[in-house]
Amino acid sequence: MGYMIVEKHTSELLHLKRSPGIRSWSILVGIASVGLAAAYYSSDSILWKMFYVTGCFFVALQNMEEWEEAVFNKSKNEIELKTFSLYTMLLTLWKRGHEKVLLDLRHLRDVSVQEERVRYLGKGYLVVLRLATGFSYPLTQSATLGSRSDVEALAALLKRFLGLEELQQRLADDDYPDDDDGIEDLGLGDSSDSQDDPDGDDDEEH
């Protein structure tokens, strides 16, 4: 599974989605199977067997990836990041688990790929949104393992959709004006205009 999939892509809206991959589901099934096996072969009471199954199930959910969405809306000038955690929802009895963050699209200045350590599994990659306010915000809460190319491809898609390269060029032109303008501001014009006629003083004496 790639980093994120494109759910919808128009000239004004880009909708990205991500769901738990095969690794997450494999971990869930594997840890839950350990709990079931412990309960099946154990001679303990029914309460202990339920504890084995429930404990392993929650450990598996804790290590499971989340469902995530990102919506870039040009017409509303906003970025909407949504996260759904099954573990948090069950732990809080459905009171929490859905999180939403709204960012101002006009403050977005750059999109980059960042490397991050993934617990027990090595290094992964994720996209980071860099804002004009100086803050950076990850596009997803967890990094993806494997090839960096999928994450870089998504970052390139975001840059094209939002026109960030053109924006960065305009900002650079505003910060560093043409050299000719700087010379004029210092009062350095044509050197021939500032030189006096060497024979001018002699003519006035005569």
From Swiss-Prot:
Entry's Gene Ontology BP terms: innate immune response; respiratory burst after phagocytosis
Q: Does the keyword Protease apply?
A: no
In which compartments does the protein localize? Endoplasmic reticulum membrane
InterPro entries linked to this entry: Cybc1
* TM ranges: 21-43
One Gene Ontology cellular component:
endoplasmic reticulum membrane
Q: Using the UniProt record, give the first listed, main subcellular location.
A: endoplasmic reticulum
State the membrane topology: Single-pass membrane protein
- Give residue spans, biased composition: Acidic residues: 174-184, 193-206
**Which keywords fit this entry according to its UniProt record?**
Chaperone, Endoplasmic reticulum, Immunity, Innate immunity, Membrane, Transmembrane, Transmembrane helix
Cite the residue spans of the region called Disordered.
172-206
**Pfam families documented for this protein:** Cybc1_Eros
What job does this protein perform? Functions as a chaperone necessary for a stable expression of the CYBA and CYBB subunits of the cytochrome b-245 heterodimer.
Q: Which family is this protein grouped under?
A: Belongs to the CYBC1 family.
**Official protein name in the record:** Cytochrome b-245 chaperone 1 homolog
Starting at the broadest rank, the lineage of the source organism is: Eukaryota, Metazoa, Chordata, Craniata, Vertebrata
Gene name of this polypeptide: cybc1
